């Protein structure tokens, strides 16, 4: 009996192979789409997390408004839970490339003599690592949206418009590009904010430690112990890092005030030293002036010895030489007095400025930043979460279409085999024995479809979507592994839906008696439709049009399945075109309707226009543009 049923099932598949394949492929498409999109977000998060961990990107970045000292770094390293620390000097400056384009550049001075670094490592894509202090490697993403981006061999020169810190602390005015790298600290083409140049970082450069000469550190990068075992984008990681952040902020409150006191003491000593120098300088100038005046008096006395001069030539020659020396001394003393007075005034002004700067030193503060505070990390997380949100909606359409196809296919298959089903019922087969054949039919198609869908979906969809985001982020290729947890969730839902559609198709036949099933099924009765009550319209329709209209309402199940299927497919297409058009319009709406300007100038003082006559004249001149003032404080 079992052998006969098995043969009957296989015979049924061969006789309706097209229907079997249609169910198989629609299930493969639905399951693959659902599984693939559901795996996209975890795959993208896992890929980025693996990249950050592999190149040892910092967990926390500590900055200080007054700088960090070696004592601060040692105090950070002694906190329980800190695995590794790396102090660094980071400075934003404006560099000019060989095309005379100014590039706001963030310079990371964290490479040792071998060009290596303990934290924040990077992958060398082209060229070599820096060997001297005037060489650098640059982030590869700079070549995408930066005009005339630097290439290997180009020389970058410190711009005159760069800030004072760059001129003071840069050991060289030029940097030669010797390599191109990719770093997990700079995964996004979205530019980080900056206080130099245009206000946004256009280029990231990595140099040797000796390039920046300040006696303090601007940053202290650290790894938290056991954080590498957690997913960077998970809530567990965030909570774990927040605990360490709280410890660092507590330490920062103490260390920042100590740093402020240290700077105040150093400043006071320097001011006292400058004041002492100025006092001694004034004393020396006063003494030289008195000596010059005494020499002048003595020179006047030589006039009384004129007769003696005329009578004694040798004495006359000596007195002439003496008079000349006195004259030179008088002239030099006069000039020195004027120069000294100007220098004293400059010293007084410098001391006053230093005192004002000393008085302006606040208590200072530590800025504790995590990976989540970087622009690239935040944007990447937001975009992946958007993909995750779309994955919760789009696969439902494919799943619904798969159910409709299965229901339609199985309904027609069962209707065609009414006579066979009636014969089997008359021979004493139970309903489950009869319809088990069709359940196995749809089950085998669903299982094979899920297997094919999983094999393709887990690889195809995450890879394609990740590649699409490749234009915005510099990340390594994705592995896209098979995810059993998602497969075990999608497979029962898909297979259960197909089986439910099959049982629903069998239900109406189960209620019929064998005699009714062995007879051909009577066609659905025709009914008058609404259009027939409009003679003017009905009479002008052809016979085919009338039959079509009647059949639409005669077979309501087919009508609704067709409508729902077409509606779902149309909705998917409309959504796709809508997303494309919406993205294409962003740039136009941003700069054509919202930001109606080509240049933005930020002033430190809201009263700058009123106080600066030159600026006011420039803005009110007959320039071929319109000027609107809006101020914000810095």
Predicted regions and their residues:
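Membrane transport/envelope proteins' first extracytoplasmic loop
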Residues: 2-400, 431, 471, 586, ...
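N-terminal Sec/SRP start-transfer signal
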Residues: 1-35, 45, 413, 439, ...
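Juxtamembrane segments of multi-pass membrane proteins
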Residues: 543-634
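Alpha-helical transmembrane segments of integral membrane proteins
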Residues: 22-33, 388-408, 442-453, 486-490, ...
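Small-residue-rich transmembrane alpha-helices
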Residues: 407-412, 417-419, 443-475, 484-511
């Amino acid at each position: 009996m079992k052998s006969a049923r098995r043969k009957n099932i296989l015979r049924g598949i061969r006789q309706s192979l097209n229907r079997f394949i249609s169910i198989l492929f629609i299930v493969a498409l639905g399951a693959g789409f659902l599984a693939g999109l559901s795996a996209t977000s975890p795959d993208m998060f896992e890929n980025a997390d693996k990249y950050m961990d592999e190149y040892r990107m910092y967990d926390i970045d500590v900055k200080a408004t007054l700088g960090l000292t070696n004592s601060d770094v040692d105090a950070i390293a002694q906190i329980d839970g800190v695995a590794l620390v790396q102090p660094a000097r980071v400075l934003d400056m404006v560099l000019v490339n060989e095309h005379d384009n100014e590039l706001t550049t963030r310079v990371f001075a964290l490479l040792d003599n071998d060009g290596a670094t303990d934290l924040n490592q990077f992958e060398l894509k082209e060229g070599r690592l820096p060997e001297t202090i005037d060489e650098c490697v640059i982030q590869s993403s700079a070549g995408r949206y930066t005009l005339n981006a630097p290439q290997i061999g180009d020389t970058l020169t410190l711009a005159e418009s760069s800030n004072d810190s760059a001129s003071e602390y840069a050991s060289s005015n030029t940097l030669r590009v010797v390599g191109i790298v990719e770093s997990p600290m700079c995964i996004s083409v979205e530019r980080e904010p900056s206080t130099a140049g245009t206000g946004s970082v256009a280029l990231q450069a990595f140099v040797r430690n000796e390039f920046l000469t300040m006696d303090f550190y601007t940053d202290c990068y650290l790894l938290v112990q056991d954080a590498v075992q957690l997913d960077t984008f998970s809530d567990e990681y965030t909570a774990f890092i927040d605990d360490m952040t709280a410890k660092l902020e507590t330490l920062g409150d103490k260390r920042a005030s100590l740093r402020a006191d240290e700077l105040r003491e150093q400043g006071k000593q320097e001011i006292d030293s400058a004041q002492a120098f100025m006092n001694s300088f004034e004393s020396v100038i006063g003494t030289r002036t008195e000596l010059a005046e005494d020499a002048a008096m003595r020179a006047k006395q030589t006039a009384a010895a004129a007769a003696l001069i005329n009578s004694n030539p040798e004495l006359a020659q000596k007195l002439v030489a003496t008079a000349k020396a006195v004259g030179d001394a008088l002239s030099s003393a006069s000039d020195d007095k004027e120069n000294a007075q100007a220098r004293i005034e400059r010293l007084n002004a410098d001391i006053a400025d230093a005192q004002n700067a000393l008085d302006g030193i606040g208590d200072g503060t530590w800025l504790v930043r995590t990976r989540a505070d970087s622009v690239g990390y935040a944007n990447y997380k937001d975009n992946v979460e958007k993909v995750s949100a779309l994955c919760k909606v789009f696969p439902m359409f494919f799943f619904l279409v798969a159910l409709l196809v299965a229901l339609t296919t199985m309904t027609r298959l069962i209707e065609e085999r009414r006579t066979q089903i009636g014969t089997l019922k008359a021979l004493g087969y139970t309903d489950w024995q009869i319809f088990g054949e069709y359940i196995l039919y749809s089950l085998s198609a669903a299982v094979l479809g899920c297997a094919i869908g999983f094999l393709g979906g887990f690889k195809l969809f995450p890879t394609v979507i990740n590649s699409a985001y490749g234009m915005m982020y510099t990340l390594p290729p994705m592995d896209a592994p098979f995810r059993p947890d998602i497969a075990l969730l999608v497979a029962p839902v898909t297979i259960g839906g197909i089986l439910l559609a099959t049982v629903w198709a069998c239900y109406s036949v189960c209620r019929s008696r064998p005699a009714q099933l062995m007879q051909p099924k009577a066609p659905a009765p025709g009914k008058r439709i609404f259009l027939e009550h409009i003679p003017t319209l009905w009479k002008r329709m052809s016979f085919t049009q009338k039959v079509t209209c009647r059949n639409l309402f005669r077979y309501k199940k087919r009508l609704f399945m067709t409508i729902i299927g077409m509606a779902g497919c149309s909705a998917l297409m409309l959504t796709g075109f809508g997303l494309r058009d919406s993205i294409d319009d962003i740039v136009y709406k941003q700069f054509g309707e919202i930001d109606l300007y080509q240049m933005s100038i930020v002033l430190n003082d809201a009263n700058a226009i009123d106080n600066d006559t030159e600026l006011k004249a420039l803005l009110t001149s007959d320039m071929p543009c319109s000027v609107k003032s809006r101020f914000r404080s810095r």
